[in-house]
Amino acid sequence: MTRRDFIGGAAALAAVPAFARNPEDIRGVLLHWGHNMWGESLPDDVKSVKGGRLCNDHAKFDETLWRKVIDRMVERRMNLVVIDLGEFPIYPSHPELAVKGSRSADWVRGEVRRLKSLGLEPVPKLNFSTAHDAWLKDYGRMVTTKPYYRVCRDVIRDAAEMFDHPRFLHIGYDEERISHQKGFQCIRTDEVWWHDFLYFVKTVEDAGMRPWMWSDYGWKHDDFVEKCPKSVVHNNWYYDEWLDGFDLSAMKPDAKSRPLVELFLKLDKAGFDQVPCASNWCSPDRIKAKASNDGCMADMVKFCRANLSPERLKGFLMAPWAGDFDERDFLKTNFAGIDQLAAALG
């Protein structure tokens, strides 16, 4: 298949392009270059915000630690890395999104080439969830306007070019729910939510990539599975935050975890490709119970292999969520996540 054939097929939605070379081809880890997906983007002279936190005014990145984590991935036979971009690159089309220490497009291109030379497939991630788009700065307050659509389209194209036209682009879109938006004056929902989501799907496909997303909008929206285009790759994430496990027959009918686990089955039945995501991150409930989450990925692999169609189970993603580059915690958390995924997959 030529690149022209791929783009034409994706744009027309005539067929879903081949996702993986073999079943469970993806052995992936989520890592972060940018960190301004959590916080408030406010004027420089505002030094604090009540009940929240401000975005970083500089890139929080340690290249030495980054390379150590990448080396661990290679040692443990990982083959794909999803990279949260956020404010980290200097986007050629919108350099105003950069912060102090953001890296040039040439640096990104060089690192992408290096990762490929190590046998890793780099996948760019641009989180367009309104709960995680502070990296867009003022444009994040222009949701559903022409300037917003233009900027989002431009940075998607930039990511495609900097990553040498990758197979996928992760659009984020997690935690689009009231509990994460209760401080907002306006909330994107219902028809407007769908309008913007479908805009991102089409824009990613028009740029020659396949859209990849967090699936949690489907936990509480029954129409999600029906309306979502089949071209979207689903990252349903389940971290077993409330210690309910994966056994639906043992869960109470009103268990918080039930809709999360059930969504794996619904997506599979509807014919979606999936890359289920687990984590070694510990929720407050787990910390209170003094229960580690080191077995979450192994339990997920066992559940998914037993219950999902092999042809649609395209691999697994580990999300350690080791955000800050504090050497001890950063390496410990990422190494543990990588090792747990490697052990679970065998």
Regions from the PLM with identified roles:
Residues 222-229, 235-280:
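Glycoside hydrolase catalytic-domain groove-lining segments
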Residues 5-20:
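N-terminal export signals
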Residues 275-286, 291-346:
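Substrate-binding cleft of secreted/luminal carbohydrate-active enzymes
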Residues 30-233, 238, 281:
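Aromatic-lined carbohydrate-binding surfaces of glycoside hydrolases
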Residues 23-31:
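Transmembrane beta-strand segments of Gram-negative outer membrane beta-barrel proteins
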Residues 25, 77, 163-167, 307-312:
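Short loop/turn motifs at secondary-structure junctions
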Residues 62, 66, 104-108, 148-153, ...:
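Well-ordered, non-membrane alpha-helical segments in soluble/globular domains
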